[in-house]
């Protein structure tokens, strides 16, 4: 299934039905009086967070959603039927923004959560509603009220316990495929991973969700490489596993490049719990490995873990370290532009794939 993390959608709730002008007509009843029914209420547009979804791809093929109009009132005091609601299913982690892409309307954080995005118009009153002691035979009724319409943006930020970050070709996809059943594309060239990948990892009987975030390069927050379109997914990760390629020119500089991009995008990202690991240790000589480890230790101000995603060396230790810190991390880090502070929401270029 293709991955899509942002979509623009048009919605319109149903118009209310019109009220009816009618009078009772029966044999031997000279003054039957008004009996026009009220119009039905228009259908709502409802958004629901559904289990089993991890992409907004459905909204590439259908961008317009219009709820049903309420039925018109009829004689004999018959009221119009209510219009059918439309329920739009989205993955957990989806945010709804106004057309300006900055005003946050709602943020879905749990399965089954529902939000009424547009309410249907109320039905109009029939002439029976207007009967009074001074107006025994009203000959007017109300039209139904129109529904609400607007353009909105759906933006998905994947929710994972841990996120893999690093430069392109740091071995993130190889690591994910080694520790989970996920099958990301793996090749010896930059930007092999074009979309975030999720995998469920089991370590010593403890399960957690690991996300492989496409590689970042210098200037990513300004649109370089794959840009900052995936940095938003990191906001929802409780812990970061930062992988550095031991075969790169300078492990310390590689570490600082990624940290700089995270900080430039949002200062909250650098405050997350981070585990630093030097990958591909099987591909370098012992002397070079020691140099790279020392460089990385000075840059990160912590001793990095050593591992090889290909041979599996050091992988169990990294997983145990992740399990240990995931338990300490906040259950849900506050994302930029959440409902408490929508003004901080940052514009984000759509993922078009």
Swiss-Prot record:
Residues 1-159 form the Obg domain. GO terms for molecular function: GTP binding; GTPase activity; magnesium ion binding. One of its GO terms (biological process) is ribosome biogenesis. GTP binds at residues 166-173, 191-195, 212-215, 279-282, 308-310. Residues 160-327 form the OBG-type G domain. InterPro entries: G_OBG, GTP-bd, GTP-bd_Obg/CgtA, GTP1-OBG_CS, GTP1_OBG_dom, GTP1_OBG_dom_sf, OBG_GTPase, P-loop_NTPase. Pfam families: GTP1_OBG (PF01018), MMR_HSR1 (PF01926). Its main location: cytoplasm. Its EC number is 3.6.5.-. Mg(2+) binds at residues 173, 193. This is GTPase Obg. It comes from Rhodopseudomonas palustris (strain TIE-1).
């Amino acid at each position: 299934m293709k991955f899509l993390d942002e979509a623009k959608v048009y919605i319109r709730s149903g118009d209310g039905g019109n009220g009816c002008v009618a009078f009772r007509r029966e044999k031997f009843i000279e003054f039957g009086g008004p009996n026009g029914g009220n119009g039905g209420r228009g259908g709502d547009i409802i958004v629901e967070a559904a289990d089993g979804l991890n992409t907004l791809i459905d909204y590439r093929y259908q961008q317009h959603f219009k709820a049903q109009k309420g039925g018109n009132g009829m004689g004999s005091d018959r009221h119009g039927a209510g219009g059918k609601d439309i329920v739009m299913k989205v993955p957990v982690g989806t945010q709804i923004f106004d057309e300006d892409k900055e005003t946050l309307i709602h943020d879905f954080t749990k399965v089954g959560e529902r939000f009424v995005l547009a309410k249907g118009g109320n039905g109009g009153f029939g002439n029976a509603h207007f009967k009074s002691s001074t107006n025994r035979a009203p000959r007017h009724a109300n039209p139904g009220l129109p529904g609400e319409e607007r353009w909105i943006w759906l933006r998905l930020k994947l929710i994972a316990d841990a996120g893999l970050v690093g430069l392109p070709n740091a071995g993130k996809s190889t690591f994910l495929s080694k520790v989970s059943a996920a099958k990301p594309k793996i090749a010896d060239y930059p930007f092999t991973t074009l979309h975030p990948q999720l995998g469920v990892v089991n370590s010593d009987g403890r399960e957690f969700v690991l996300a492989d975030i496409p590689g970042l390069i210098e200037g990513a927050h300004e649109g370089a490489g794959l840009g900052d379109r995936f940095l938003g997914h990191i906001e929802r990760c409780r812990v970061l596993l930062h992988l550095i390629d031991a075969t790169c020119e300078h492990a310390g500089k590689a570490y600082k490049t990624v940290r700089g991009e995270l900080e430039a995008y949002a200062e909250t990202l650098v405050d997350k719990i981070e585990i630093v690991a030097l990958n591909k240790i099987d591909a370098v000589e012992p002397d070079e490995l020691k140099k790279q480890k020392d460089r990385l230790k000075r840059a990160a101000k912590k001793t990095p873990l050593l591992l090889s995603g290909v041979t599996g060396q050091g992988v169990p230790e990294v997983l145990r370290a992740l399990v240990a810190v995931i338990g300490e991390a906040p259950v849900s880090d506050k994302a930029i532009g959440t409902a408490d502070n929508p003004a901080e929401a940052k514009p984000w270029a759509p993922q078009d794939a």
